[in-house]
C-alpha cells in the first residue's frame, strides 16, 4: 500500500464493484470505512446513470471496531436482499477494512441461510492486485460459480447454437468507450453473419450465464478484463477464444481472419476476405486517409504512447505501421502483464517503459519532447504543462472521455475515430506561427511550462521579450534548453544575453 498523488489503476475493490454493477440485478455490499465509498458518486457522474448505483457500504465505524463486523454485515446483506430482490449479492472488503482480518467467508455462509438470493465473497487479495486484475478475477469467479452449479444441476445446454455465435467478454461500466465499443462490435458481428449470444457483464443477468457455452467462440476485445473468463470457458467447455483487439485497420482485419479460422475449424464454411477488402478499400475512411497528403504530413513526427496494455499496444502499432509516425516511447502501467506488452510493441517503437509512476512518464516525455502524446488523463495534464498536445486513448480518464455522441475505438468506425483523434492531436507548426503573426480572438502571452510546478530561475523582461519572438511551436524547447544551460552555468536570472549564449552553446 502506498500514498500516491495519482494512480493509473485503482484499488482492487473498484474492479470488483465495476463488475458487479455492470450486471443487471446484482448488488454489491462493500465492507469499508467512510472514504472508500466514492465508487457510487464516480459511476453516477461518469456514466451519467439514470438509476442508482447498486452498491451499499457497510460502514466500518467505532462500533464495528469494538464489537466486530459480523452482525452489521449480515444485517446489511439481508436488508438489501429484502429491499432490492437481487439475483446475487457480492460482498467485498477494501484494502483498508482487510486490515481487520475478519472471516468474511463465514459471514457469507451465515447470510446464505436466510437470504433468498445467492451471496458471494469476492475472491480477491486486496494487497496484491489492482483494479484491473480484480475485475478480471471477479468476472471469472461469478461465471464459474453459475456454470459449475448449472453443471451439477444438469441444466447446462448441451449443444452449440445452429448458426455461428459469439460471447463478447469484458465490457464493463467505467470502461474506456466500452459502451460505444459494444455497439460497434455487435454491428461488426452482424455484418459477418454472427449472432451475439451474450455480452458479459454489461447489462447481462446472472441467469444468462448458463447459456455462455452455446456460443461458437469467445471474443475478448480488452486484455485487461475477460481473459481469465475466456480461459476458463476454453478449458472447461472447449470454447476457442479470439483475443486480438480490433483497433485500427490492420488489427481489425487480423481479428476477423482469426474469427474466420475459428469458425471454419468447427464446420462453418465462411470467407470474410471480400468483406475485409470492401471495408478497407471503400467503406472505411481510415485506409484512404493513410494515403492522403494529410497523413504524409505526419510521417516521421515523434510521438509518445502510454496507457493500459490493450490501448497502448494497439495505438503504437497504428501510429507506426498505418500512419508512419515515429513512436519514440511506448509504455504501459500494467506491470503484471509486461512481457506481453513488450512482445507486442517490439519493432514498433524506440523504447519501452513499464511503470505505474506518473513522474517517470512525465520525466520521459519532458526529456524526449515529442510532437504529440497519446496517453491517459495524467499524460494530458503533463502535455498541458509542457505545451505538447495530447490525445486521450486509455483509462483513467475524466468526464470528457465519456462522450454522449457515438465514438467507438474498435472496428472500422473505430478506425475512423482514431484517425480523427491522431490527426487533431498534432499541432501544425504553421498554425501557431500564423497566430503569433496575425493574432486572434484569444491571443495571450504564452510561456511553455516545465514539468515542475515552479521554477527556480528568474526570467528578466528582456529575456522574455526575446523568448516571445521565437515561433510558438519551438518556443517551449528553446525555453527548456535555456533554463538547462542557466542551471549548468550556476545562473539564477535569465536575460537576453543568457538566451543568446544558450543558443550558441547548443550550436543553434
UniProtKB/Swiss-Prot annotation:
It is an enzyme of class 1 (oxidoreductase). The active site is at 294 (proton donor). Substrate binds at residues 429-430. Pathway: Porphyrin-containing compound metabolism; chlorophyll biosynthesis (light-independent). It comes from the Bacteria. InterPro entries: ChlB/BchB/BchZ, LI-POR_suB-like_C, Nase/OxRdtase_comp1, P-CP_red_C, Protochl_reductB, Protochlorophyllide_Rdtase. The keyword Coiled coil does not apply. One of its GO terms (molecular function) is metal ion binding. Its EC number is 1.3.7.7. It catalyses: chlorophyllide a + oxidized 2[4Fe-4S]-[ferredoxin] + 2 ADP + 2 phosphate = protochlorophyllide a + reduced 2[4Fe-4S]-[ferredoxin] + 2 ATP + 2 H2O. Binds 1 [4Fe-4S] cluster per heterodimer. The cluster is bound at the heterodimer interface by residues from both subunits. Its cofactor is [4Fe-4S] cluster. GO terms for biological process: light-independent chlorophyll biosynthetic process; photosynthesis, dark reaction. Keywords: 4Fe-4S, ATP-binding, Chlorophyll biosynthesis, Iron, Iron-sulfur, Metal-binding, Nucleotide-binding, Oxidoreductase, Photosynthesis. [4Fe-4S] cluster binds at residue 36. Component of the dark-operative protochlorophyllide reductase (DPOR) that uses Mg-ATP and reduced ferredoxin to reduce ring D of protochlorophyllide (Pchlide) to form chlorophyllide a (Chlide). This reaction is light-independent. The NB-protein (ChlN-ChlB) is the catalytic component of the complex. Protochlorophyllide reductase is composed of three subunits; ChlL, ChlN and ChlB. Forms a heterotetramer of two ChlB and two ChlN subunits. Belongs to the ChlB/BchB/BchZ family. This is Light-independent protochlorophyllide reductase subunit B. It comes from Synechococcus elongatus (strain ATCC 33912 / PCC 7942 / FACHB-805). The gene is chlB.
Amino acid at each position: 500500500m502506498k500514498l500516491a498523488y495519482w494512480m493509473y489503476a485503482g484499488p482492487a475493490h473498484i474492479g470488483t464493484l465495476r463488475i458487479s454493477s455492470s450486471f443487471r440485478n446484482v448488488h454489491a455490499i462493500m465492507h469499508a470505512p467512510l472514504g472508500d465509498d466514492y465508487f457510487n458518486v464516480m459511476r453516477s457522474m461518469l456514466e451519467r446513470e439514470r438509476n442508482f448505483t447498486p452498491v451499499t457500504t457497510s460502514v466500518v465505524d467505532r462500533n464495528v471496531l469494538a464489537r466486530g463486523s459480523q452482525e452489521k454485515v449480515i444485517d446489511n446483506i439481508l436488508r438489501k436482499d429484502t429491499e432490492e430482490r437481487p439475483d446475487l449479492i457480492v460482498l467485498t472488503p477494501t484494502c483498508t477494512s482487510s486490515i481487520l482480518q475478519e472471516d468474511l467467508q463465514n459471514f457469507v455462509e451465515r447470510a446464505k441461510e436466510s437470504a433468498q438470493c445467492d451471496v458471494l465473497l469476492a475472491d480477491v487479495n486486496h494487497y496484491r492486485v489492482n483494479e484491473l486484475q480484480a475485475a478480471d478475477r471477479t468476472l471469472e469467479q461469478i461465471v464459474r460459480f453459475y456454470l459449475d452449479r448449472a453443471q451439477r444441476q444438469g441444466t447446462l445446454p448441451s449443444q452449440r447454437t445452429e448458426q455461428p455465435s459469439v460471447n463478447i467478454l469484458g465490457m464493463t461500466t467505467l470502461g474506456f468507450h466500452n459502451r460505444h465499443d459494444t455497439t460497434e462490435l455487435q454491428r461488426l458481428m452482424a455484418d459477418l453473419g454472427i449472432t451475439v449470444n451474450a455480452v458479459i457483464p454489461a447489462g447481462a443477468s446472472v441467469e444468462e450465464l448458463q447459456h455462455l457455452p452455446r456460443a461458437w467462440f469467445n471474443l475478448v476485445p480488452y486484455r485487461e478484463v475477460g481473459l481469465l473468463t475466456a480461459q476458463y470457458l476454453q478449458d472447461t467447455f472447449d470454447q476457442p477464444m479470439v483475443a486480438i483487439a480490433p483497433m485500427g485497420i490492420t488489427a481489425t482485419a487480423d481479428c476477423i481472419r482469426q474469427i474466420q479460422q475459428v469458425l471454419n475449424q468447427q464446420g462453418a464454411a465462411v470467407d470474410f476476405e471480400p468483406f475485409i477488402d470492401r471495408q478497407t478499400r471503400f467503406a472505411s475512411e481510415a485506409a484512404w486517409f493513410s494515403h492522403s497528403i494529410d497523413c504524409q504530413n505526419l510521417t516521421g513526427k515523434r510521438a509518445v504512447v502510454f496507457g493500459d496494455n490493450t490501448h497502448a499496444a494497439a495505438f503504437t502499432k497504428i501510429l507506426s505501421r498505418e500512419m508512419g509516425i515515429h513512436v519514440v516511447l511506448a509504455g504501459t502501467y500494467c506491470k503484471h502483464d509486461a512481457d506481453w506488452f513488450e512482445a507486442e510493441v517490439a519493432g514498433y517503437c524506440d523504447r519501452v517503459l513499464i511503470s505505474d509512476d506518473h513522474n517517470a512518464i512525465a520525466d520521459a516525455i519532458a526529456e524526449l519532447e515529442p510532437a504529440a502524446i497519446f496517453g491517459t488523463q495524467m499524460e494530458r495534464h503533463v502535455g498541458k504543462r509542457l505545451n505538447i498536445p495530447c490525445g486521450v486513448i486509455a483509462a483513467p480518464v475524466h468526464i470528457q472521455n465519456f462522450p454522449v455522441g457515438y465514438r467507438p475505438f474498435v472496428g472500422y468506425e473505430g478506425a475512423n475515430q482514431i484517425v480523427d483523434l491522431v490527426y487533431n492531436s498534432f499541432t501544425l507548426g504553421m498554425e501557431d506561427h500564423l497566430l503569433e503573426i496575425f493574432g486572434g480572438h484569444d491571443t495571450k502571452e504564452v510561456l511553455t511550462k516545465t514539468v515542475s510546478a515552479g521554477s527556480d530561475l528568474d526570467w528578466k523582461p528582456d529575456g522574455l521579450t526575446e523568448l516571445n519572438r521565437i515561433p510558438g511551436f519551438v518556443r517551449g524547447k528553446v525555453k527548456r534548453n535555456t533554463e538547462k544551460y542557466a542551471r549548468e552555468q550556476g545562473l539564477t536570472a535569465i536575460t537576453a544575453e543568457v538566451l543568446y549564449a544558450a543558443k550558441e552553446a547548443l550550436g543553434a
